[in-house]
Amino acid sequence: MDQDVLKKQVAEAALRFVPEGDIIGVGTGSTANFFIDALATLKDRIKGTVASSEATAERLKQHGIEVFSLNDVGSLSVYVDGADEVNQHREMIKGGGGALTREKIVAAMAKEFICIVDGSKQVNRLGAFPLPIEVIPMARSYVARKLVALGGQPQYREGFLTDNGNIILDVHNLDISNPIELETTLNNIVGVVTNGLFAKRPADIVLVGEKSGAVNQY
């Protein structure tokens, strides 16, 4: 089954977690885009959304779905987003699209985090996908040296700036045997805004679109 079909299928399955009359958080990326398209069918049943990126906000508005500033919202009942990798503990690597900081903020606000993926994103151990780290531009070289000292191989994502005006270092070959510990260690490096490990705040529910046509939940 085509990967886009799987993404569409799992995105539509996430609609059952959308409470009527609430403001919900919406993620960024290809699978999240399928969720936005599906959410448009329910737009009259929700109060609105909070977007984790400018691109997501634009797509929501194109569907006529209201987008609120997170600063105007006290809490979110649910946040729906994809992942680049997810393990059996529902810990994730996110940020392939560069929206990791805003995604992490919206996830922190949400009572329930629903992660939607196709089966190719499930892993036993995180780290085959390079770990994105958002960095203040002037700290790029300093942070890169610190990452090398931790055993990583940082690669500057050239020509890309986040919605916050920062740069991304994609780090290969990090030992992610303890995701919670590494998430904290990386965030303690001066100049790092945040990293793409979602371990301290993992997903509450993972929905997986399988090639068989089934959507599994764990």
From Swiss-Prot:
Keywords tagged on the record: Isomerase
Any GO BP: D-ribose metabolic process
Residues forming the catalytic site: 103 (proton acceptor)
InterPro entries membership: NagB/RpiA_transferase-like (IPR037171), Ribose5P_isomerase_typA_subgr (IPR020672), Ribose5P_isomerase_type_A (IPR004788)
Residues at which substrate binds: 28-31, 81-84, 94-97, 121
EC code: 5.3.1.6
Coiled-coil spans in chain: none
Enzyme class: isomerase
Domain of life: Bacteria
A Pfam family of this chain: Rib_5-P_isom_A
GO MF entry, a single one: ribose-5-phosphate isomerase activity
GO cellular component terms, semicolon-separated: cytosol
Pathway participation: Carbohydrate degradation; pentose phosphate pathway; D-ribose 5-phosphate from D-ribulose 5-phosphate (non-oxidative stage): step 1/1
Catalytic activity: aldehydo-D-ribose 5-phosphate = D-ribulose 5-phosphate
Record's subunit section: Homodimer.
Function: Catalyzes the reversible conversion of ribose-5-phosphate to ribulose 5-phosphate.
Family: Belongs to the ribose 5-phosphate isomerase family.
Protein name in the entry: Ribose-5-phosphate isomerase A
Name of the gene this protein is made from: rpiA
